[in-house]
């Protein structure tokens, strides 16, 4: 059998790789790598949001061949790793600090990830001016974990092979550069093993990505004046900003809430099998998510950007009315159990909900009416509590025709204290609909007589 690298005339935008193996021995007999026709589409869509602020080559629809080749090199490194028997290692990108990833000397020597088998491509922790200093901006070489893994798999051993391999592995016990990160199970999320993450500081990562997206919102309309640029690319461009915010920004950082570091058990290892993310870190992440997503007015500040996608009055309202970021935060609530159980000083579900409520009602506690973004977040919060609580589900079924609506707006002189504990009797009507992009102005709740 022969190894092949094929040009694929399809609409895929990712390099593919698979091996033909002997099922009896596991021996790799052949490797097949496919390079898609539309690789440039992926570079154009993904690279611009993370790199345009840092690298001027991304500030155009017409991506230079040089940039495409750099991207292809990065993707082929992983493909070659797969052909040699290496598995996807989602922890590689979490091994280094933001300071290391902004160092020209460090990145030129070690690259931007400890393993190219991760799914990271770009060094989005870099800042404007770092490229000129020599900071590496894209995966360009195998990481230290890759080198060790190839040694482990293929190096000849003159002594007892099993003992030698165990010795080699234990020499790197506890070193994050050599940690192999599998995809986390749903009930135990390891924040080191996330798609699209980079660096070991989630706060710095979030700040960097938001700064890059803000730059794109402010400047991108000037990049697309050419009439030859396809309309569908122009029209979908703002939508990809939302995808960037939700999938590549909010999802990785929220995994620290209820997160737990999982290390495979080894009787000789000094690393615990389970190590919950500290309560302090979880609190910091929650506060950072609220402070970042509380005010998304910058998404609406450039009308030319909004008009790329047609007649859009704003984008922030769409995000809020579709439940972000609260939907992601309540998703994490259901996955805090193992972290709480294994921690000596846990960040409990009750403490988490209390902290969320402090953020939700910060305006009210300061004597101000709830803003439209907070009303939208409150709606998702109440709806989630009702869906998770059997008691509230029963109440909802019994009194579905007697749900009372209260308008929460600046004209209503309300006192939220009269609602009592929202975690006990709040609900959002399952049939309530918000029209178009209009800000949410009301939320339904149970009155005392309902309970």
Residue ranges and their predicted role:
Residues 1-83, 87, 111-112, 122-125, ...:
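Metzincin-family zinc-dependent endopeptidase catalytic domain
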Residues 92-451:
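Conserved catalytic/binding loops enriched for acidic/polar residues
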């Amino acid at each position: 059998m022969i190894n092949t690298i094929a040009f694929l005339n399809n609409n895929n935008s990712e390099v593919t790789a698979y091996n033909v193996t002997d099922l009896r021995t596991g021996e790799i007999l052949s490797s097949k790598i496919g390079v898609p026709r539309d690789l440039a589409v992926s570079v154009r869509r993904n690279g611009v949001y993370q790199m345009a602020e840092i690298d001027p080559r991304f500030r155009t629809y017409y991506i230079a061949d040089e940039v495409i080749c750099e991207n292809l090199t990065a993707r082929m490194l992983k493909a070659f790793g797969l052909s040699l028997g290496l598995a996807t290692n989602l922890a590689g990108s979490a091994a280094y600090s933001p300071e290391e990833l902004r160092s020209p000397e460090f990145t030129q020597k070690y690259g931007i990830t400890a393993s190219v088998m991760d799914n990271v491509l770009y060094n989005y922790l870099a800042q404007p001016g770092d490229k000129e200093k020599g900071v590496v901006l894209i995966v360009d070489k195998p990481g230290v974990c890759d080198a060790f893994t190839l040694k482990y798999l293929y190096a000849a051993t003159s002594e007892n092979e099993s003992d030698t391999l165990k010795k080699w592995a234990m020499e790197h016990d506890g070193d994050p550069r050599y940690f192999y990160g599998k995809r986390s199970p749903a009930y135990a999320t390891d924040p080191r093993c996330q798609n699209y993450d980079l660096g070991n500081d989630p706060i710095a990562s979030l700040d960097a990505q938001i700064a890059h997206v803000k730059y794109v919102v402010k400047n991108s309309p000037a990049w697309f004046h050419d009439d030859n640029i396809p309309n569908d690319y122009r029209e979908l461009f703002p939508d990809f900003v939302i995808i960037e915010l939700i999938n590549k920004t909010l999802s990785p950082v929220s995994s620290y809430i209820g997160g737990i570091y999982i290390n495979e058990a080894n009787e000789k290892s000094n690393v615990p099998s389970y190590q919950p993310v500290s309560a302090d870190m979880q609190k910091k992440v929650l506060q950072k998510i609220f402070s970042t997503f509380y005010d998304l007015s910058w998404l609406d500040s450039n009308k030319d950007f909004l008009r790329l996608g047609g007649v859009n009055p704003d984008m922030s309202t769409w995000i809020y009315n579709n439940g972000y970021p609260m939907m992601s935060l309540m998703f994490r609530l259901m996955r805090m159990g193992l972290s709480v159980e294994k921690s000596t000083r846990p960040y409990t579900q009750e403490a988490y909900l209390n902290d969320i409520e402090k953020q939700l009602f910060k305006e009210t506690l300061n004597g101000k009416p709830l803003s439209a973004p907070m009303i939208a977040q409150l709606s998702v919060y109440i709806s989630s509590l009702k869906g998770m609580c059997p008691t509230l589900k029963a109440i909802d079924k019994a009194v579905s025709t007697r749900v009372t609506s209260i308008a929460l707006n600046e004209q209503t002189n309300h006192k939220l204290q009269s609602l009592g504990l929202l975690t006990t009797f709040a609900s959002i009507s399952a049939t309530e609909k918000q029209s178009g992009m209009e800000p949410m102005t009301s939320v339904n709740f149970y009155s005392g007589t309902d309970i």
